[in-house]
Regions:
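Hydrophobic faces of well-ordered beta-strands that scaffold small-molecule active sites
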Residues: 2-6, 68-71, 108-112, 136-138, ...
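Active-site environment of divalent metal-dependent phosphoester hydrolases
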Residues: 7-11, 75-78, 116-120, 143, ...
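Short, flexible/disordered intra-domain loops and linkers
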Residues: 18-20, 39-45, 77-89, 175-183, ...
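Distinct, well-ordered alpha-helical segments
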Residues: 119-129, 147-152, 177-193, 209-223, ...
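H/E-rich (His + Asp/Glu) clusters that bind or coordinate divalent metals
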Residues: 205-309
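Short, well-ordered coil/turn segments that N-cap beta-strands
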Residues: 63-67, 104-109, 131-134, 162-164, ...
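An N-terminally biased module of ancient metal coordination in phosphate/nucleic-acid-related enzymes
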Residues: 1-71, 77-88, 305
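Active-site gating/metal-coordination segments in enzymes
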Residues: 73-181
């Protein structure tokens, strides 16, 4: 099985095209990653290699997941389409994503990130497709663009023509500085769907605000209207998103569009599994724990390989 939602983290080493702001290095997520993975921010090349080695070890331990989509992260772009580093928390370059994916094609697929606001967005899509990208990932809340803006229809048409799925963050964004949280509303992905793009709403289209889940009506409409609309299961064991797991349990028609994903390196928690399954989940490897929790709740997932256009 493929995990469709795995983040590629990297520090800038002078060659990989990545960027991270001083502010981002002080944020809880960066401190958590440094602690959990024993990363030395003063030795970027070593830290980057160790992150990949750790991910490969987790994949070796998994009986369920054999390949993952590595996700990049584009930056914020100004009105002229130029990169605005003053508003960019971090950037994981497509060059780096493609390079790492090529290094282990048996384990990694490339999930590039292209902000449609960038001046060369269409050219970058063409390049990524030619170099074997599996999908395009966006995080509108932090990348400061509105997915519903009509100016991006040519971008969506290019995605459809190139048969590149669009994996879009849904809900509130806490790990980065979410500047416009309304951009995480899945209803804003309608233009992409109307243009024929295979759209995957991240995190089960949950809002990320604990019990408040306002997007269920939109999700049910999209499932009924668009055969090329999907959701992924990433981050759904986290307390602020777990409510959507129990909603999915009650809606088998939505489950039919659910794709397996975790949101690595964020934690996968065992507590939604009940009874003896809890112990099984708690003892399982990282990727298998997600599979055990979902199975315990009677939630089935599709494999990303089966839904690519």
């Amino acid at each position: 099985m493929i995990d469709v939602h795995v983040h590629l983290a990297a520090l800038p080493d002078g060659e990989n095209g990545c960027y991270i702001s001083a502010k981002m290095l002080r944020r809880p997520l960066a401190r958590f990653l440094a602690w959990k993975y024993k990363l030395d921010f003063g030795k970027p090349a070593e830290a980057n290699a160790f992150y990949i080695e750790r991910l490969l070890r987790e994949l070796e331990r998994s009986a369920q997941v054999k390949k993952v989509v590595l996700l990049g992260m584009d930056g914020v772009y100004d009105a002229a389409g130029s990169l605005d580093k003053t508003r960019t928390d971090f950037l994981i370059s497509n060059d780096y994503v493609l390079q790492v994916a090529r290094s282990r094609p048996d384990r990694f697929l490339a999930g590039v990130s292209v902000n449609p606001q960038r001046r060369d967005a269409l050219e970058e899509l063409e390049r990524a497709a030619a170099e074997g990208a599996a999908l395009v990932k966006v995080l509108p809340n932090a990348q400061c663009f509105d997915p519903a803006d009509g100016r991006y229809r040519p971008f969506y048409r290019a995605l459809a023509r190139l048969k590149l799925p669009l994996l879009s963050h849904v809900g509130y964004e806490f790990s980065l500085a979410g500047r416009d949280q309304s951009a995480g509303d899945p209803a804003r992905l309608r233009n992409a769907l109307d243009e024929g793009v295979t759209v995957i709403g991240a995190h089960g289209c949950s809002q990320g605000l604990f019990a408040y889940e306002p997007h269920v009506k939109t999700v049910r409409e999209f499932v009924h209207r668009y055969p090329h609309f999907y959701l992924d299961a990433s981050a759904l064991t986290l307390p602020n998103r777990v409510g959507m797991l129990f909603i999915l349990k009650r809606h088998p028609e939505i489950q039919q569009r659910l794709i397996f994903g975790t949101d690595y390196p964020l934690p996968v928690l065992a507590y939604p599994a009940l009874g003896r399954r809890y112990l099984e989940a708690a003892r399982a490897s990282y990727f298998d724990r997600q599979a055990v929790v979902l199975k315990n709740l009677g939630i089935s997932c599709r494999d990303f390989a089966a839904v690519t256009p």
